Amino acid sequence: MDIRQFRHFAAVAETLHFGRAAERLGITQPPLSQSIQALEKALGAPLFARTKRHVELTALGRQWLPHVLEALAAVDALPDTARRLRDGQTGYLSLSFVSTADYSVLPDLVRRYAEAFPGVEIQLVEATSDVQVPAIQAGERHAGIIIPPPNRSLPAALAYRRLVSEPLVAVTPEAWGAEGPLDLAALADVPLVLFPRTVAPAFHDLVTGYVAARGQPVRIVQEAIQMQTIISLVSAGLGMALAPASLRKLARVGVRYVDLVDPPILETGLVWRRDEAAPTLQGLLRLVTEDGSAPD
């Protein structure tokens, strides 16, 4: 059996006339009759009941016809599907992201991508930068939004593009009554709630380096791997945190976001494999390029 025989069957089933079906198909009647006979032989049952004046579908033919028409429609759609896949208009995009991107670049980037490519399924995975980089290298993700390591020292196989740079702010328990701009040097104690260095070395070093530069000892009282959890621990009064200014959008009872004196700047960017040719990724890169940043 082949697709040609299915088209022959559908034409005869829809016209119930071998002559008209042959005319529709652009062939003569004898080859059409032979094709149907071969199909019936392969199936081991007749599809049509024939008389000299009349052709009608058998019970098998009537029940099989919808399946054949569905299969033919799917086959006919394959060229357009291939073109849409080639152009990145369909398929999927797998994008990982750090929790700090939830309130900065991620929502706008995803919204713009969904508007530009509504036929693409966006698969989002939250993960720390240290988890994202090897996953992207292994081809498990198309791209990731990360906090880059110092000096952007990423593997040579990966490309990187800065998305945003923003100041850090102090996140303090409401009960502290802190007002900005806050100078950590003026505080009696700076108990920190922070990412573990093993999962976020760049962010960890940025925070601890700033605290030390303001003349305070680095005292970490709690660690968590998600920024939302860190904010919750601050609201519980366990300490203070430094967070991207965009996290002000995360309203949480019991915390206060306070500007810092000479705040450190946190960079967030997009990373992907240089040899990754997925059309859906290329669409994302075109959107990012429109923002005017250059890849490293």
Curated annotation (Swiss-Prot):
Pfam families: HTH_1, LysR_substrate. PANTHER family: LYSR FAMILY TRANSCRIPTIONAL REGULATOR, TRANSCRIPTIONAL DUAL REGULATOR HCAR-RELATED. Belongs to the LysR transcriptional regulatory family. Positively regulates the expression of the ilvD gene while negatively autoregulating its own expression. GO terms for biological process: amino acid biosynthetic process; branched-chain amino acid biosynthetic process. One of its GO terms (cellular component) is protein-DNA complex. The keyword Repressor applies. It comes from Caulobacter vibrioides (strain ATCC 19089 / CIP 103742 / CB 15). It comes from the Bacteria. Signal peptide: none annotated. Gene3D superfamilies: Periplasmic binding protein-like II, Winged helix-like DNA-binding domain superfamily/Winged helix DNA-binding domain. SUPFAM superfamilies: Periplasmic binding protein-like II, Winged helix' DNA-binding domain. This is HTH-type transcriptional regulator IlvR. Keywords: Activator, Amino-acid biosynthesis, Branched-chain amino acid biosynthesis, DNA-binding, Repressor, Transcription, Transcription regulation. Residues 18-37 bind DNA. One of its GO terms (molecular function) is DNA-binding transcription factor activity. Residues 1-58 form the HTH lysR-type domain.
